[in-house]
Each structure stands twice: as structure tokens, then as C-alpha cells.
Amino acid sequence: VTTVPTRTRVLAGAALAAGLFCSAAPAFAALTSPEATAYVVSADALNNNVAVPPQPLSTYPPGGTQTLVGLTVGPFATDAALTATTAGDPTLGTSSASATVDHLTLTLGPALAGDLTGVQATCSADPNGATGNGVIASGTLTVLGIPTTLQANAPKNTSVTVPGLGDVTLNEQSTDANDVLTVNAVHIVLLPALGGANVIVGHVECGGAPAAGAVPMIDAQVGVIGGSLAAAAVLGTVYYRHRA
């Protein structure tokens, strides 16, 4: 029978405990300070037009309101005001954003048109997470003279397929690994035959962060595993001293 030295057993036990700690502890990714983004329109290149970058664009920090009165670019046309606003408070770890336009028309291709009213995307975030909403008061997408009515105040991630045009998501919402919430009031993805372009109306992003000076909370699972590791180390040390 081969006898393993006591010191070897202690070191092996500590290594095993450390391995369990590293493998079982979940990975965390979080913002260190709050952030927010808002814009009213953006589009990939389509209809022989260049891509439309996000506009008007507001980001926090530093935050503030950006406004365009009237717009004719790419597939978009309106004489209404487009307004994007962001704000935040690092002391509280909060952020907010909004993107609005009262009326907007879309030209997505030959005999492909759209009309939207009352577009509003909003979000807010704090250290515990983010919430948001993206709505329209009314909307239609018309293909070869045949209109498809878009739902007003749609539940999040409402999907609509428009024959001859593509897919539309109303009140589109997603959250990334940093708990940053993204909301699109209207997101159109054209058919591949039409170029597969993305067209977005009403976009906001919000991410919260720990309040300034706050002590980060330790995840319960990490706490349990960490406590077990500490206990194992203490017991191993006692055992080793007893055998020495």
C-alpha cells in the first residue's frame, strides 16, 4: 500500500477546493458607471442610397437633448421634430433615454412605403436593472398598394411578417451581458432580395451601475463556495498540524 504524505494530501485538498471555486463561480459582467444612448432613425444602405447613421444622436455621458426639425435622408422623410434625450446620475447609478418623432414616412423601394405616427422609445436603468418600452400610435407598411396595419402600443418583441417586404419587430427589446437594455420601437429587416437592410425607428439603450461608493454585493453562490474554500483551508491546516 502506498502512503501519501500528509502535506501532499493537504495541498491536494486545497487545490481541489480552489478548482471547485473557480469552476462553479459564475462570471459577472457589469458596467462601472451608468450609460445611455438614444437616436430616432438609422438605416443600412438601400435604394442606391448610402447608409443613414443614427440621428439625431444623444449619449450619456454627457447626456442632453439633440433635435432635428425635419429630415429627408435615405428612406426617411418628415417635417416633424426628431428628438433624442439621455441623462444619468453616477451617484445613484441611474440612466435614462428617449427617442421620439410625431410622424415619419418611409420609402423602402419601388411600391414599398411606410407611415408611422407617435413613435416613442424610452428606457431607464438603476443598479438593479433596466426597463423600457417602444411604441407607435399608428403605422402601416404598404406593398404594391396593399397596406399592412402595424399594432399600436404593441407588447414587447411583437413580430410581423409583411409579404413582399420583410420582417418587422415592434417594441423590440434585448439585454446584453452587462445588463444594458436596448429598445427599438420599430425594426424592419428587408427581404434578402431587397438587400436585407435594417431600418430602425426609435432606438434607446440604458444601463445602470453600482451607486458611487456602494460596496458590490457578492453573489450567493460565490459566497457559499468561498466560505467552503475557507473552511477547507482551515480544516486542512489543523489536520496537517495534528499529523506533524
Language-model features: where?
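Bacterial N-terminal signal peptides
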Residues: G13-S23
